[in-house]
Amino acid sequence: MLNNEYCKRVYEQILARDPDQKEFHQAVYEVLEGLEPMVERRPELEKNGILERFVEPERVVTFRVPWTDDAGQVHVNRGYRVQFNSAIGPYKGGLRFHPTVNLSILKFLGFEQILKNSLTGLPIGGGKGGSDFDPKGKSDAEVMRFCQSFMSELYRHIGQFTDVPAGDIGVGAREVGYLFGQYKRLKNASEAAVLTGKGLTFGGSLTRTEATGYGLCYLTAEMLKTLKNDSFSGKTVVISGSGNVAIFACEKATELGAKVVAMSDSNGYIHDPDGIKLDIIKDIKLVKRGRIKEYAAQVPGSTYTEGFRGIWTIPCDIALPCATQNEITAAEAEEIVKGGAMAVAEGANMPSTPEALSLIHI
């Protein structure tokens, strides 16, 4: 509950202005709750309307994205770019292609990106963008045509000194490559810094793909060492998701001596008591772009279960949610606690609801 009157008033203004943006409300509330002690000490923040500026994007761009499928049928999706804050540098944040994408989700992601980017010590601001386009089940040619259409509008609003997008859910090196190619075509210039997450053959960075998953495990290892005088060694780990964050969290946790026994995608989850065979997961998800249920068909002794939320019923020592926002509700948190987990570390953006956090924070 917010106690500071200034924080409370700013939050109430957000609720009144955008009553349907639940994910954004949640992100702002959590941040304001953490900022209350500082706000109490700094009355000049209220005088200068700093929090009001902090929670309102500088600019929101919405546009249509027409594209043609392989059968010649025209489709129209909606594209977004939320340019949230450029106080210390160009907007910086990923692009998400997923059917659930809406303004509330992108505002929450862009808002959190301000804080994440400021912690790097680099002069970069925060933003986020994407579309309700679903790349799953689409051919390479269809994804390329969509990306080219998307960039045909987005290019007007970005630049290496203005706004630097990257990847997120549904946007990997393939999609970034298509987007970058169209940007170069439209601008008649090779501005490599306009997009991050590119392939290594055209300006990408080594370990960029692994960075989030590895970083999550390094942070978790430090938490275990500092707070529990313990480590990953010999621990059982459950990881939700099977994208870049989850895959490379699995890789690093295994290197640190843990046994990862479960992973998931949006349809369901796999359980392998002997430990996930990561080479098979990589082949299914990164090479074939398939579904995780294919793992159970290839690995004797493993099982696949429909419905991704059930993954948290599997007992573990360490839980690493790496899928999507609000994947852990109070019900899942209760299962994690019941299963005896000693640590929960978040790899996804805001994967736990406030009710879940109240159960996990003990």
Which positions does each model-derived feature cover?
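Conserved small/polar residues in nucleotide/adenosyl-binding loops
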Residues: 360-362
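Rossmann-fold NAD(P) dinucleotide-binding segment
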Residues: 308-315, 327-341
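Short glycine/serine/threonine-rich phosphate/pyrophosphate-binding segments
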Residues: 245-249, 327-331, 352-353
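Generic long, charged, amphipathic alpha-helical segments
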Residues: 332-351, 356-358
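Glycine-rich phosphate/diphosphate-binding loop of Rossmann-like nucleotide-binding domains
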Residues: 207-210, 214-310
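Short, well-ordered coil/turn residues at beta-beta hairpins
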Residues: 320-322, 347
